[in-house]
Amino acid sequence: MAEERSQRNRDRSREEKIDDGMIEKLVAVNRVSKTVKGGRQFTFTALTIVGNGEGSVGFGYGKAREVPVAIQKSMEYARKTMANVSLNNGTLWHPVKANHGAACVFMKPASEGTGVIAGGAMRAVLEAVGVKDVLAKAIGSRNPINLVRATLKGLEDMQSPTHIALKRGKNVRGFSHGS
């Protein structure tokens, strides 16, 4: 009982579903200090994900002197930079590996009912884009910004069998696993 409640509270604090149908997730907030003649100046950075849960997702990184302003800036930027991703009934079309900097992500499709098995920043991206079943692993750096960028790069590089068949000028039936 207590575990369920703590799980609900954790999810509620990190995710908001806004009236326009967008899912907004706060991935990380960081305090940065700059030492000047008069002492230290503190600023805050925020990393956020915005998605519609149906294959569209974007991320934003905002900086400001106050946390709410940094979050607001990053949300606005995330909405401006949204990209579309092709999904296969709530999972991926094929296994994907992508890098950004020293962060490397590996994602593969999972059978229905598996859920999102991913950590941290990857989980936020996958849930916002609308993936329901996936197995994912972060290798190398766990820097949230690089993990988000690598995850998005992998999702954008993923192609449906129909798209590949059109590019090659072949029939989709020729792409089955048995042939």
From Swiss-Prot:
Pfam families, per the entry: Ribosomal_S5, Ribosomal_S5_C
Q: Which GO terms describe its molecular function?
A: rRNA binding; structural constituent of ribosome
Q: Which domain of life is it from?
A: Bacteria
GO terms for cellular component: small ribosomal subunit
PROSITE patterns with a match to the protein in the record: RIBOSOMAL_S5, S5_DSRBD
According to the entry, every stretch annotated as the S5 DRBM domain falls at: 22-85
Q: Does the keyword Signal apply?
A: no
Task: Report keywords, A-Z.
Answer: Ribonucleoprotein, Ribosomal protein, RNA-binding, rRNA-binding
Any one Gene Ontology biological process term? translation
Q: What is known of its domains?
A: The N-terminal domain interacts with the head of the 30S subunit; the C-terminal domain interacts with the body and contacts protein S4. The interaction surface between S4 and S5 is involved in control of translational fidelity.
Task of the protein: With S4 and S12 plays an important role in translational accuracy. Located at the back of the 30S subunit body where it stabilizes the conformation of the head with respect to the body.
Q: Which family does it belong to?
A: Belongs to the universal ribosomal protein uS5 family.
Against PANTHER family, the record matches this protein to: MITOCHONDRIAL RIBOSOMAL PROTEIN S5
The record's section on HAMAP family has: Ribosomal_uS5_B
Q: How does it assemble?
A: Part of the 30S ribosomal subunit. Contacts proteins S4 and S8.
What name has this protein been given in UniProt? Small ribosomal subunit protein uS5
